[in-house]
């Protein structure tokens, strides 16, 4: 069977439609446009025009036309959009802070909560997410960028690019100016081709359209191409950017001053070194784990700038199988850290990271990826953690790869761990199929006893078997129902000695209405060893894609680990007055006693660079008194120059800590 599948991979072609893989020729700008959000007459005479956007869901021309323009010179790339709209009053723009995600879905949400325009560049033609540069703007001129590899939030590092937008009687216009030095691109070449796409999301109709149709599956190898670019002739000069900081903390017991520095050295246009000495994480608000029952350790998103910088170059491991091989939250405080990442060649990517806590712990991560083609890749991963006090030297090495032909995919990984209480291995093989309405995955898995990684997140060990996931979804352009999806996910595994481990599965259904209601339900029934999990979940949300007016409730009831179980999760996200955002999320679990969690977050926007915010975290465990941790903060950041932070309290404490912190970050 495996040989038959591999034969299919060698014979099947990649999906393509007439509106995919479009090509436009690069042109130099002789008339420099004024970036004011108004496309003036004869302001873009040299720019190449891109039109004929496609609705990704229907595959037909978008209902409202969009035009894009692109040109360049020795210093900048210039991009403009003209987005026509029959109902200009229906253009939605809400976010005002730079690098807002225009998203209704939190850390993993898609851009779906307001109108936006976006240009996507793939300078290495790799068709890999980690190599893409995305620049988007909403109708309030709020910029949002996702630079290749991942960047932290400081403007000096995230790129000093500009964008402006203006509503018109015919819709809205947008203009962008992107410095070459913001981009990673192949150096030493006289002519380049970039992967290119233009995207528009129209909130009123919920239509996402693209110039080069990548289909609902977002196949990146179907992006367009911007050809015959002549990059800047001036030879690249390595540049060094320094961000020293000073942090003063005043407590009842006294005060202290802490200093440190972050540095970013751009070796070439496609390779970067970042280092930090005495980093400060005390002022970074960490994400909070939910109190809901989970048989595996919960994944918590990373928010610390050092680990966000270049994060995509270290990504390895299947999130939905064994877990991520590098889980940066494993690394706590350290004294010095350094990372180097980027392209060795257009097809070879390297990431290296080390963090040293003198006298205690040293962590090292290495990730290498080779792009065989736009749809195929192979990679190596290595991780080592040396903890002196435990004499523990934990390591992991892994080989992984992926192939795709048309709508069929194959992913695999081989993992071997070593160290104290760890010496197991793991392997998985994942076959997938996806088209406009279906996604199916069949995974074969084998995890040995004692597989462990001090820097990774392994959900389970000592099992072998398979799991299946199937999703069927539809989206409609007319009628009361906007979208519908069904998920089915059976799983059958055994321990390595052959005794049953997990057997069962689940079924989920979700409806989204035209009026922005979301209704969902799911049923799960599993046996874990001799324990039964049997639950039913109900969810309802009003304003599902509008975080400024959203109310929801989730209820899970049934049985977990042979015990009666009930979980309530209310959430409210609201903007009661202009510039004031409030978010409440709760979790109440009845499972051999009550566990309660309440999180209230507030943020008042004084300007695009100044905010006042805070959070109150209340947690209660069975038989213990509740802990309450409030803190408030003032932040002046988001643009070039000195940043100022003032905090009362400690964001990541369990209970309130009476202290004041003042932090200044200087750009050099």
Which positions does each model-derived feature cover?
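Outer-envelope beta-barrel architecture signal
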Residues: 75-77, 131-133, 172, 190-194, ...
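Residue-level marker for the onset of beta-strands and adjacent loop->beta junctions
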Residues: 22, 64-66, 161, 259-261, ...
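Bacterial N-terminal signal peptides
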Residues: 1-9
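Catalytic-domain carbohydrate-binding cleft regions of carbohydrate-active enzymes
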Residues: 176, 193-195, 253, 272, ...
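Structural preference for beta-rich elements and adjacent junctions enriched in aromatics
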Residues: 15-363, 369-370
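Surface-exposed extracellular loop regions of Gram-negative outer-membrane beta-barrel proteins
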Residues: 235-274, 363-418, 540-552, 568-588, ...
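A short local loop/turn or secondary-structure capping micro-motif enriched for an aromatic residue
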Residues: 34, 43-44, 86-90, 143, ...
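Exposed, low-structure sequence patches enriched in small/polar residues
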Residues: 333, 341, 411-668
């Amino acid at each position: 069977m495996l040989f038959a599948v591999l034969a299919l991979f060698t014979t099947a072609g990649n999906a393509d439609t007439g509106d995919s893989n479009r090509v436009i020729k690069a042109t130099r700008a002789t008339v420099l446009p004024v970036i004011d959000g108004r496309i003036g007459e004869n302001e873009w005479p040299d720019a190449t025009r891109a039109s004929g956007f496609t609705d990704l869901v229907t595959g037909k021309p978008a209902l409202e036309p969009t035009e894009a323009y692109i040109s360049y010179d020795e210093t900048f790339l210039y991009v403009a959009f003209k987005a026509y709209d029959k109902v200009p009053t229906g253009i939605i723009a809400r976010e005002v802070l730079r690098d807002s995600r225009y998203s209704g879905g939190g850390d993993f949400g898609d851009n779906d909560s307001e109108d936006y325009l976006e240009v996507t560049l793939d300078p290495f033609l790799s068709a890999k997410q980690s190599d893409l540069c995305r620049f988007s703007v909403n109708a309030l001129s709020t910029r949002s960028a996702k630079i290749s590899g991942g960047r932290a939030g400081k403007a000096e590092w995230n790129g000093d690019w500009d964008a402006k937008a203006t509503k018109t009687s015919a819709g809205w216009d947008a203009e962008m100016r992107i410095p070459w030095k913001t981009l990673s691109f192949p150096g030493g070449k006289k002519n380049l081709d970039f992967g290119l796409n233009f995207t528009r999301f129209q909130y009123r109709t919920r239509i996402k359209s693209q110039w080069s149709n990548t289909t609902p599956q977002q196949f990146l190898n179907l992006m367009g191409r911007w050809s015959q670019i002549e990059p800047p002739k001036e030879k690249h000069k390595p540049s060094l950017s320094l961000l020293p900081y000073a942090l003063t903390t005043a407590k009842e017991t006294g005060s202290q001053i802490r200093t440190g520095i972050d540095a970013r050295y751009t070796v070439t246009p496609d390779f970067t070194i970042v280092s930090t000495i005495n980093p400060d994480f005390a002022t970074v608000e960490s994400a909070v784990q939910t109190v809901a029952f989970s048989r595996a350790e919960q994944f918590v998103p990373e928010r610390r700038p050092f680990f966000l910088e270049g994060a995509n170059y270290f990504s390895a491991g299947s999130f939905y199988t064994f877990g991520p091989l590098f889980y940066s939250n494993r690394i706590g405080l350290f004294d010095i850290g350094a990372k180097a990442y980027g392209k060795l060649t257009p097809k070879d990517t390297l990431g290296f990271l080390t963090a040293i806590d003198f006298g205690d712990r040293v962590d090292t991560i290495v990730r290498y990826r080779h792009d065989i083609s736009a749809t195929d890749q192979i990679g190596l991963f290595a991780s080592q953690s040396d903890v002196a006090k435990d004499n523990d030297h934990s390591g992991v090495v892994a080989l992984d790869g992926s192939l795709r032909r048309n709508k069929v995919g194959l992913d695999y990984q081989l993992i071997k761990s070593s160290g104290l209480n760890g010496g197991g291995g793991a392997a998985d093989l994942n076959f997938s199929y996806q088209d406009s309405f279906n996604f199916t995955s069949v995974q074969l898995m084998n995890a040995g006893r004692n597989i462990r990684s001090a820097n990774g997140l392994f959900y389970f060990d000592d099992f072998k078997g398979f799991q299946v996931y199937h999703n069927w979804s539809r989206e409609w352009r007319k009628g009361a129902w906007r979208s519908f999806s069904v998920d089915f996910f059976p799983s059958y595994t055994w321990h390595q000695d052959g005794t049953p481990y997990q057997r069962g599965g689940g079924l989920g259904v979700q409806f989204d209405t035209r009026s922005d209601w979301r209704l969902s339900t799911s049923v799960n029934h599993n046996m874990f060893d001799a324990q039964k999990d049997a639950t039913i979940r109900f969810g309802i949300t009003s304003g599902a894609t509008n975080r400024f007016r959203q109310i929801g409730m989730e209820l899970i009831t049934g049985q977990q680990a042979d015990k009666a179980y009930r979980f309530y999760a209310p959430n409210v996200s609201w903007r009661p007055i202009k510039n004031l955002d409030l978010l409440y999320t709760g979790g109440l679990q009845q499972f051999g006693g009550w566990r309660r969690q309440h999180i209230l977050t507030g943020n008042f926007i004084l300007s695009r660079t100044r905010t006042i915010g805070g959070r109150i975290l209340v947690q209660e465990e069975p038989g213990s008194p509740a802990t309450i941790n409030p803190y408030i903060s003032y932040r002046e950041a988001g643009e070039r120059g000195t940043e100022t932070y003032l905090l009362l309290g400690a964001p990541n404490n369990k209970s309130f800590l009476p202290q004041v912190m003042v932090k200044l970050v200087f750009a050099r």
